[in-house]
């Protein structure tokens, strides 16, 4: 810059423009509905549209669906839902926008005058715009269909049940099922494919007990980056001895109700590819898969590293904790695939085993609660629940909202089936 004054001035001009733009877009007096959010041009333009819309007119905007999914967007949604008339969500699989990736979602939104009563229509999982017209005129006959048709192609067929009319009661349903009732009038707008799904959600809403109502611990055990730096574990593929607390699980090890789904190869380099599927019919009774990690600290220190439940007090009044690693726990894959065969994947992990943060586990004070949750979370009902949410990661708050506590008349069958698997 010292040698080229013109280049310096050009840089300074760009810097001033960028800083001023960011300051303007993040100023609360300019965009009060976006306070507490990560702003972007789409959100700012959407707020401008709501402010400038003529009471007798309508405004249409195409934008990403982030505002409907942002946990910090409750204030924005509370105003938006009162002005929203139509929300049509697309998945770009037909490449209507060739410059963005095929899995990106976006929506067309029609905004009108402020309406004190919530009342708008929504269609999700659209691939072509002509499906909208068909849904509006359909007579309701026949089956609605899913995301794909019987030939495995993306379903562009219209059906009356694809059209969801949202009012105060339906938004409260979403709030109760997915957000513990904390945002009655402005919950996140999850992807509801058809009206039939709302009936299923009503059943889930009516479930009386949840994980949060039971004594439990949720943990990731060891962070894949932090734990090696702290000298707790190291990356090394080897055959573990469970009795010596050698087994450390990661995501690919487990599948639905199966902690022995895959084993890493002796040379495991590529995270999700260097694994072989385990044939459960061929392995011996004492077989166990390899692990990619080796513990570096003494057994007693390792066992007590993650605190369990309080078991009493010592002579000085200090609390005595159990060892979490010594519990049976239910391990979940932390990363969830919304397009895979199953989204919610979990299995009961044996005592004396741990895992890295690619797995998130829960243990209960009462061991039967662990079996209860294992059975429920292996079901297609809970898998449907997570697919409806559309989340890519399983967070503790979401796990705490899972239904739990099966009626006694079903327990015997559920427990025997779950433990047999």
Region spans (language model):
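S-adenosyl-L-methionine
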Residues: 1-421
